[in-house]
Each structure stands twice: as C-alpha cells, then as structure tokens.
C-alpha cells in the first residue's frame, strides 16, 4: 500500500509537469539549440553525399562541454520547483507518512531524469538527419573526427576518440550516454531536493547552477583531475572512455560514483524528512 501511495504521488507530480507549458517551451528551446548545432553536420552530409550515424553523433555531441553545460542548466530549470511543496504539498504531507511523501519526490526525480536525458539525446539524434537504422557502423565522417581530423568550414560539434569508436558500437555509446546522463541528472535533482529542505528553494537553485557550470569551469581553468568532482563530466565519453588519461575517471568508476552519490542523497532526503523542525519549517515556509 505504501509503494502504491508513493507511485500515486509521483504520478501526480509528473501530470503537473506535463500540464505546465513552460516544460514544452524548454523542449522547444532545446530543439532549436540542437538544430543549430547540427547545421554544419547537415550541410556536410548534403554536400559530400556521406552520412553520419545519428546515434553515434548524439553520443559525440554529449561528449562536448557545451552540451554538458546545456544539460546541467536544463536540469536546474526542470527541478527548480523541488521539493514541490506548493499547492497540495501541505495536504499530502499531513495525509501520508513522511517516508511516503519524500519517497514520491525521489521517485519523481528518478523517472523525470530518465525521461529528460532520453528526450534530449533523441532530439540531438533526430536533428542530425543522419541514419537511424544503422546501429553498428560509425561511418566515414565520425571515424574521420575520431582520428583527429576536421572538415574545414563545416563545424561538427562532436568529440570522439578512437577508443570509443573501436570498442563501442554507436548504439552502445548512445545507451551509455543516456545512462550516465540520467544518473547525473538524478544526482543533481536529489541534491536540490535535499538543499531545498535545508536552505530553501533559492539556495537549492544556486547550488544546482554551480554544479551545472562546474564542468565548463574545469575545462577552462582548473586541472583535469577536478573532473572527478563534477557529476556532469561523467556523461562525456571523451572523459570516461579515455584510457590514455590516467587522471580521468573510467566509465566504470564514474558509474559507481554516480550510484553512490544518488544513494547518499536519497538517504539524506529521508533523514531530513524525519527531522521534525526542518521538515515542518520547510513545508510551512514554502506553503505560506
């Protein structure tokens, strides 16, 4: 019965998200962004007569720090209402147990993270106008980029290495990127959930923004070992699938770290829900 209530609370929040026009406005912005990124790739395919693998292209684009920045900032916007304590939250919190209340929000973060990561990568793949039916061959264009060559005036925002193209199929690279992106997004959402119960919504959003831009700051200014501190950096195959760089985390290490981070944030959220003063203060502050 408790799990049924948790699922019911999660579905209520998902329905509220899908009824919110801002959600669709963000999706349209992402579509325009990925369409703009793919402009050089589309022209290159049209003028060369060669094709790009859509799945491999999406994985390569998400290996770029610019797409990682967009992914992180989009996650902050997506979870900016956590812990969703407005409107019906006070009623929900008094009618069900605290474990059920916080469990519904944790389940919501997990499901929305998978949906969010999958939608963005699919948008990226579809806007490339590449081949969707080919799942095993990277194609000449992506293999050329993986070997370190460019295409002159054609800007193809793909970051791939030979290790990726030699050891993974395009569909496997796409699936691994979806998995890591969903886990990183969930870690951000759970962190914002905990912080919103401790310091309020503004503090949670500020912390989320700092995590979102950390990968970009590391790329520009900080030593590369700092990638271990950025969960969004684990979504980039150019980092987690680069054995030549010993100070980069491997994808296995990144996967374990993301799972541990999510587990710790869930335990902290349950702990905060059982802190009488903190829980009641957070609920009433946002409600009134």
At which residue positions do the language-model features occur?
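Junction motif at the cytosolic side of a transmembrane helix
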Residues: 194, 198, 260-288
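Alpha-helical membrane-protein architecture signal
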Residues: 3-11, 99, 103, 171-175
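Central hydrophobic cores of alpha-helical transmembrane segments
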Residues: 27-31, 203-216, 284-287
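Aromatic- and glycine-rich beta-strand/loop motifs that create alpha-glucan
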Residues: 1-26
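Secretory targeting signals
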Residues: 31-80, 103, 107-197, 230-259
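Transmembrane helix boundary and interhelical loop/hinge segments in multi-pass membrane proteins
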Residues: 78-94
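Membrane-helix interface segments
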Residues: 97-99, 200-205
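Juxtamembrane membrane-interface segments at transmembrane alpha-helix termini
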Residues: 41-42, 217-225
């Amino acid at each position: 019965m408790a799990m049924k209530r948790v699922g019911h609370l999660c579905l209520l929040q998902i329905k509220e998200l899908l009824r919110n026009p801002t959600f669709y406005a963000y999706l349209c912005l992402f579509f325009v962004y990925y369409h703009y990124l793919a402009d050089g790739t589309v022209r290159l395919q049209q003028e060369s007569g060669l094709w790009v693998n859509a799945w491999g292209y999406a994985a390569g684009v998400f290996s770029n720090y610019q797409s990682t920045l967009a992914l992180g900032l989009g996650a902050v916007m997506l979870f900016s209402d956590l812990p969703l304590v407005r409107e019906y939250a006070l009623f929900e919190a008094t009618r069900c147990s605290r474990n059920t209340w916080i469990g519904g929000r944790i389940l919501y973060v997990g499901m929305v993270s998978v949906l969010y990561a999958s939608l963005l990568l699919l948008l990226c793949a579809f806007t490339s106008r590449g081949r969707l039916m080919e799942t095993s061959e990277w194609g000449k264009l992506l293999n050329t980029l993986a070997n370190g060559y460019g295409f002159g005036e054609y800007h193809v925002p793909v970051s791939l290495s030979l290790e990726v193209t030699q050891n993974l199929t395009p569909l496997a690279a796409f699936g691994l990127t979806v998995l890591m992106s969903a886990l990183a997004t969930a870690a951000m959402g759970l962190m914002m959930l905990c912080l919103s119960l401790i310091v309020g919504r503004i503090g949670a959003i500020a912390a989320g923004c700092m995590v979102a831009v950390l990968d970009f700051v590391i790329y520009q200014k900080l030593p590369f070992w700092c990638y271990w501190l950025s969960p969004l950096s684990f979504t980039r195959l150019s980092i987690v699938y680069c054995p030549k760089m010993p100070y980069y985390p491997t994808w296995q290490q990144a996967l374990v770290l993301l799972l541990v981070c999510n587990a710790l944030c869930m335990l902290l959220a349950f702990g905060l829900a059982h802190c009488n003063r903190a829980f009641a203060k957070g609920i009433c502050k946002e409600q009134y």
